[in-house]
Amino acid sequence: MDLSGTRLLKANRATVWAHLNDADTLRAAIPGCETLTGSSEEGFEAVVKQKVGPVKATFKGKVTLSDITPAESYTIAGEGTGGVAGFAKGGAKVWLSDNEGGTELSYTMEAKVGGKLAQLGGRIIDSFARKMADQFFDNFQEQIDGPLDPETDADASPAA
């Protein structure tokens, strides 16, 4: 499953970059994240609870950042196991660029699952991945810009 999208943020690039590397911001942005500890330099440990179709799981895993060009781009990769539910892993390439009065955040991401999760079928997994990506970037944008206004932020929706 591959996804891509763009978000227009009101903050300048330095502020957005700082939030992309901040454990508290990422914890608040990741749907279902119970804990996220660590640093962008050493990597993060995470515990995330999710329900995908009929499968509920608590995933424990690691998130790492690589290919870092400060205030411009990085690659974020994560992998977690959820016991009998299986595993999930994925990554995203994130780019920042200046935009009138703010910052444009662009991303491409991919996700893979195994175990019981993989048995749910591609449509359920694809739909879930899109929902999680949308929710992550909505939450991230709210951490920086404040609550989203559906009318004025309509141009900030992801492209599939």
Regions found by a protein language model. Give the residues of each.
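A short, glycine- and basic residue-enriched loop/turn
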Residues: 23, 33, 62, 114-117
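Hydrophobic pocket/interface hotspot
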Residues: 16, 20, 26, 65, ...
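A conserved amphipathic terminal alpha-helix motif
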Residues: 114-159
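Glycine-rich portal/gate segments that line the openings of hydrophobic small-molecule binding cavities
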Residues: 37-79, 135
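Intrinsic-disorder/low-complexity, polar/charged segments enriched in Ser/Thr/Lys/Arg/Asp/Glu/Gln
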Residues: 2-6, 43, 58-60, 73, ...
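Hydrophobic ligand-binding cavity/cleft-lining segments
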Residues: 1-51, 146, 156-160
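Hydrophobic/aromatic beta-strand elements that line small-molecule binding cavities or substrate pockets
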Residues: 5-7, 34, 60-67, 90-98
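Beta-strand/loop substructures that line and gate deep hydrophobic ligand-binding cavities in soluble
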Residues: 80-127
